[in-house]
């Protein structure tokens, strides 16, 4: 099923990846989600994003059941072309900018960008792709 889905969509999701509710992959071509990746609820991933491991596969038997890929907690948005690498955690309600390279843990409600990614802002107001909830109305 994984190979067939990749052929049809251009999205590669390892069968052992753990994915929460309401994952939204927008323009999914080139998205790669590695074997030990964990994705929380209400996560948005744009095109050409990699959730990849950084451990070399010299002896793959020694790496079985070892966490090598990222964890994305709830309500995270990953911009197009971003590379999230290694057994790190992107905490809740964080935003990762397009083409960023993230190799370290990201704290809750952080806005990250760059290569290597650095904190560039506070994501406390959140980000709702394609959603108008009524909360945005001017008072």
Question: What do the predicted segments below correspond to?
Answer:
Residues 53-60:
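Conserved catalytic-core motifs characterized by acidic clusters
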Residues 1-9, 127-139:
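Terminal amphipathic alpha-helical/low-complexity segments used for targeting or macromolecular assembly
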Residues 9, 14-15, 20-21, 26-35, ...:
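Left-handed beta-helix
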Residues 60-69:
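Regulatory activation segment
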Residues 116-123, 128-130:
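Hydrophobic alpha-helical transmembrane segments of membrane transport and translocation systems
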């Amino acid at each position: 099923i994984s190979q067939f889905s990749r052929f049809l969509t251009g999205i590669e999701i390892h069968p052992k990846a753990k994915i929460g509710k309401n994952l939204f992959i927008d323009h999914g071509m080139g998205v790669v989600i590695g074997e030990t990746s964990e994705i929380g609820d209400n996560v948005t991933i744009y095109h050409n994003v990699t959730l990849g491991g950084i451990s070399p596969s010299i002896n793959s038997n020694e790496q079985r059941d070892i966490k090598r890929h990222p964890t994305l907690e709830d309500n995270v948005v990953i911009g197009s072309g971003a590379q999230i690498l290694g057994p790190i955690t992107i905490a809740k309600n964080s935003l990762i900018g397009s083409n960023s390279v993230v190799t370290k843990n990201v704290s809750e409600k952080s806005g990250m960008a760059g290569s290597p990614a650095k904190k560039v802002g506070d994501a406390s107001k959140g980000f709702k792709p394609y959603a108008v909830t009524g909360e945005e109305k001017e008072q």
